[in-house]
Each structure stands twice: as structure tokens, then as C-alpha cells.
């Protein structure tokens, strides 16, 4: 199935594995997701730069061993993190193809990554934040609702509501996040 997201990110399937702190701060889960044709995501939040570098390299080894040496993958960096600048340096040095930024503005980093061909997706919890991300020049947004793990919107509005509002507010490709855990949820989000 081809969508704006599959075309933008070079995926076979319009599915993205969330950056789930400790659950995806190692390479195994994101590598399996990427090898299956969706977007695997390494969660950099709980990591130190050296561990992130090792996870990126291991993911590449695992996807190559699975016969998918050029499988797209992403790293999620929470921009509020006190190590965010160091983590972004690792993402740049390791030539990660897709960066997912969350919990903060682009802070002057966006141009640096886009000039190298990196796709920048920004996690948003409202139409207002989506418009700000679009105005900053990001490549796409991940609209999350109250069902999302990590740091969802404080008002806990459903992803179905947030995603619809974001789709009306921006022209960017939009990925739905939060509470999408089975085929019915995927079908519902694709119908928006």
C-alpha cells in the first residue's frame, strides 16, 4: 500500500513503530520492524551517545543480515533531553536517514539535518503545534493523542480527534500515533 508516508520515507508499509523508551532503545525491535518494511525507531531518550551509536550500528547489521541492508529506520530524540545536542551529533555522524524529534522545537537543528537529506518528523499533540512544525519546515508530523505512551497531550484528547484536527491544519504528511495497536486501529487511521 502506497501513501504519502511510504513515498516520503521509502517504506513498504505505512506503519511506524513508536520510540518506546527502554523497549526500543536497543536495536532488536527497530531492526525487525524495518526489515519487515515498516519504520523501526530507536528511542534515544534513555541513552548516552555511545550507546546510541552502538544501537544504530547493530540495527544496520541486523537489517543487513535479514537481507535488507538499506531498510529505512529512524532515531527519536526528545529535544528537552539534557543530552539532546550530543545525541543529535551521533544521529548526524551515523547518517541516520530519518529523525523523529519530540518535546521541543527544532531549535536551529532542522536545516543542519535537511541539508544532508535527513527526513525530519516532528511529534505534535495539537493542530497549533503541527502548524508551528510546518512553518519551521519539517518533512512530516506524528500527531499523537492521549493514548500515546511517553508524554502525550496533557488534556488526553483521543488520537482520532487530534489527527483529524492536524490533517485539517497542515498540508504535511501526517502519521497517527497513540492507541493504534491492531488492524482495526490501522484501518481507522488510514480512513482519516
Where are these regions (language model features)?
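Active-site entrance/lid segments in N-terminal catalytic domains of soluble metabolic enzymes
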Residues: 1-173
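A compact, surface-exposed functional segment
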Residues: 187-192
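Glycine-rich adenosine-cofactor-binding loop
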Residues: 21, 172-186
Amino acid at each position: 500500500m502506497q501513501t504519502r508516508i511510504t513515498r516520503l520515507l521509502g517504506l513498504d508499509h505505512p506503519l511506524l513503530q513508536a520510540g518506546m523508551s527502554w523497549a526500543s532503545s536497543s536495536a532488536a525491535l527497530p531492526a525487525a520492524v524495518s526489515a519487515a518494511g515498516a519504520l523501526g525507531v530507536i528511542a534515544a531518550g534513555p541513552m548516552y551517545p555511545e550507546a546510541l551509536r552502538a544501537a544504530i550500528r547493530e540495527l544496520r547489521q541486523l537489517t543487513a543480515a535479514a537481507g535488507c541492508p538499506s531498510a529505512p529506520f529512524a532515531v527519536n530524540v526528545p529535544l528537552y533531553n539534557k543530552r539532546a545536542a550530543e545525541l543529535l551529533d551521533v544521529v548526524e555522524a551515523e547518517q541516520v536517514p530519518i529523525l523523529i524529534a519530540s518535546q521541543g522545537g527544532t531549535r536551529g537543528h532542522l536545516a543542519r539535518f535537511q541539508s544532508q537529506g535527513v527526513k525530519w518528523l516532528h511529534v505534535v499533540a495539537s493542530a497549533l503545534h503541527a502548524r508551528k512544525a510546518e512553518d519551521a519546515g519539517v518533512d512530516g508530523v506524528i500527531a499523537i493523542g492521549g493514548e500515546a505512551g511517553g508524554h502525550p497531550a496533557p488534556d488526553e484528547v483521543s488520537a482520532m480527534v487530534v489527527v483529524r484536527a492536524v490533517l485539517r491544519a497542515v498540508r504535511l504528511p501526517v502519521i497517527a500515533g497513540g492507541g493504534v495497536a491492531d488492524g482495526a486501529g490501522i484501518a481507522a487511521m488510514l480512513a482519516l
